[in-house]
Regions:
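Pyridoxal 5′-phosphate
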Residues: 1-137
Length: 137
């Protein structure tokens, strides 16, 4: 799984803003709706999915769009943890993870996962040595 996050402080390219404005003002239908606006929005969404899949050389059904970082983090972490739980139920995170990461890991604890939180230095960096100590075989 590849997860993209355009940080909340990243200035988007002008072309991205222009595209967003066009889609937001002309193709604002719910892509799950049966009406014409919805059908048009669904076509546009499917076109975007195909473009991303082609770029990444993956299947279209492997591309998921989420409403934001929290939903994306939740999907990526739970999806990966549950898909690979037969390989182990131990997750290593840093002490400065986003709340959505920490909360998702707390939920996974209720499903029997162990969560290890590694510290960061004064610059907010994670030490490779700390990660290596936290990893279980």
């Amino acid at each position: 799984m590849i997860y993209f996050d355009n940080s909340a402080t990243t200035l988007p390219l002008k072309e991205v803003v222009d595209s967003f404005m066009t889609v937001s003002t002309k193709y604002f239908g719910n892509p799950s709706s049966l009406h014409g606006l919805g059908a048009t929005a669904e076509q546009l969404l499917n076109q975007a999915r195909k473009q991303v899949a082609d770029l990444l050389q993956v299947q279209e059904q492997e591309i998921f769009f989420t409403s934001g970082g929290t939903e994306g983090n939740n999907l990526a972490i739970k999806g990966t943890a549950l898909a690979f739980k037969s390989r182990g139920k131990h997750i290593v995170i840093s002490a400065i993870e986003h709340a959505s990461v920490k909360e998702t890991c707390e939920q996974l604890k209720t499903l029997g996962f162990d969560i290890t939180e590694v510290p960061v230095d004064s610059s907010g960096r994670v030490s490779v040595e700390e990660v290596m100590k936290a990893i279980r075989q």
